[in-house]
Amino acid sequence: MPTFLAALLRAVLCLATLRAAMAAEPVAVILDHPRIFLTRAGLSALAARCAGAGAADYAALKRAADDAVRAGAIRWIDNKWAVPHDLLSCALVYLIEHQAGRPAQAYVDLIIRAWGDGTMIADQRGSAFGYHAIAYDWIHDALDPAQRRRYGDALGTWLTWYTGQAAITLQDGAWEYNQTWGPSHLNVMHSRDAITQKLLIALAIGGAGTAHQADAERFLASWATRIPNECIPAFDRMGGAWAESHGHGSYGPITVIPYAFEAWRTATGQNLFTAGRPWGFLPEMSHWLTWLRVPHTGRHAFIDDGGGDRYAGFASSAPLVARALRDPLAQWQALQARADGQYADGPWAALLIDPTVTASSPAQLGLPLAYLFAGAGNVFMRSAWDDPDATWAFFGAGPHFAGHQHDDEGHFLISRRGGLVGRGGGMGGNDEDFYWGGSLVFNLVTIFDPDEHPRRATRNENDGGLLRHVYEDQRCARGSITAYRDRATYTYSAADLTAGYAPAKARSVTRQFLYLRGRPGMDEYVVVLDRVVSTRAAFAKHFMLHVPAEPAQGGTVEELVPGHVARTSGVGLITTWLSRPDDFGPDAKVLSSGRSRMFMRTLLPAPASITRRGGEGHRNWGHPLEPTAQYDHTGPRRGEPPYCDWRLEVAAPLAEQTLFLHVFQIADEAVTTMAPVVLAEDAQAVRLEIGTVEQRWRVALAVSGDLGGSVTAPGMAEAEPLPVAVETRAQYAVDATPAP
């Protein structure tokens, strides 16, 4: 078990009564300033570090503050979409220079001039009110009593923002919704409850003699009660992956939730980072943001509406997570961020790195080669750490938590030396591009009921896919990982996806995903079995797969639209294509060497029909059976990364019950022939022999009942039964399946 999570588990067991104790005991905020991220007691050590080992970081910070003083202006303070980094740089330099006994008032005076009479702080048309609160706390002791009241009153007006109450209300959003917490710019846009901004303000102005003292106390009491008793259990259910979407997590929660929890810790001494379970959001966040990194670029995978970045907002909060949890993986990411220049615009964040926390990479920590984030139902797999040529894969199925979450249950991705299986290319917002809110950008099974009328159908017609819960705020069942196990030779996951489809068309939909971790480039395979039962045989079923490079089809190929659409039919069809190393776009440095090749063997249904569709004008086609959708659903950002220009559509003969069985081989580019695959079927299972005699895998997957089976690795005499339940002891030493 990873050392960090083992230690965290012990800490959690020791803190088993923390929630109840905190509910019973009033919470005291320290009297001194600063109290947000820093304390007066820690200033001496910080100043000493700035004069010693942290001199380079401090030089960058002071240079930014000095430039602002010389210019007489704080950059971006009027930009609603930007973080006013100079504001925090000046405030932090004041603290350090004052602690060192050097002149420091010029930094405070610049902030006072910018704030003026406080109107700009209180301007509800646009104000980075969360960052103003941090700066207020840091320069508090340099303000006279009148200034403290003036600016504190301006800040205090925000405590009832949007909700009309100085309390956590969860109005128009749950704990797992990004706008409940606030965006990374801590401004008014996309701020509903704005828990982070309001907490920072309540902590900053407490005791300053403002007219909002009672509101500040009410908000702190609300936090002290609701966070331990409601939020942390919700975060335990969700786990380390921000389930709403990676993109919306990076817009705010990945940054600002650690801000809130760390501000509470430094101001009260209560460490709520450790109040949850080891698989809760904050303890597991650094793992999720590590597993998201695809080896060939070192950047986060394009899983939903996010991806393509290396940190996704974690650069600013990683130092806080690292020191609150003594998390070596978060510390490793913070040091990487510093080396990558992530703190160039906001050098204040680098000074929050605690040098006493040991940094360790995934390989140094001995992290397993697969990981299940059980709450969101995210499974990540890879062949190795510290190898840009490694294989990486993702498979996902989980419940619907919050509004922006995409309906993509059963979706999977694979890469090696570039993308091999991706999601539909380009980017888009749920409002400007409804096609992006449907199923056809993901790799899943469609069941086409011609009478289905999906939500949000503008330029997003009936696609045969999942129910569209996007923008619904209530948690609901959609998909679930029912089995999971990781071994040195394989990673197995199974999911029940039935609840994700309309009951009028689907009786049962499951997917089994087996990654066979053989020798990279030679005998590495993925087996995918879909068991699909519809309510009517007439509801046609398709296996949809997005690939970045134009695939070559085996068998007799019928060109339907030359250069864009072609079809082949038969039994045991083989399709092949090359990886695309530049699938993340021209701004992403490719770390891997060469390319890889993927072979796909369609074993079931037999016979099957495979349509290859893509290229200019055909990348975003509607469902082939929907008459009103026969056009390219292009959008304003459809040409952006990730680049994934082709779709394979495997059509099954009409029947109520259909099995889709595919074997994917991940090979080196020079390999021209797929390894042998032999299929035998009986009433209980599909049975496969994969590979040459010397390196043969034997796999059995059940075709009814529990989603189990068996696997025999090359050289092994006995078959190992596959699990029918979730096994995560290698991650935590206890199973982490969240309660319903």
Label the predicted regions.
Residues 2-14, 19:
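Sec-dependent signal peptide recognition
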Residues 302-364:
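N-terminal leader/propeptide and maturation segments of large enzyme subunits in energy/redox metabolism
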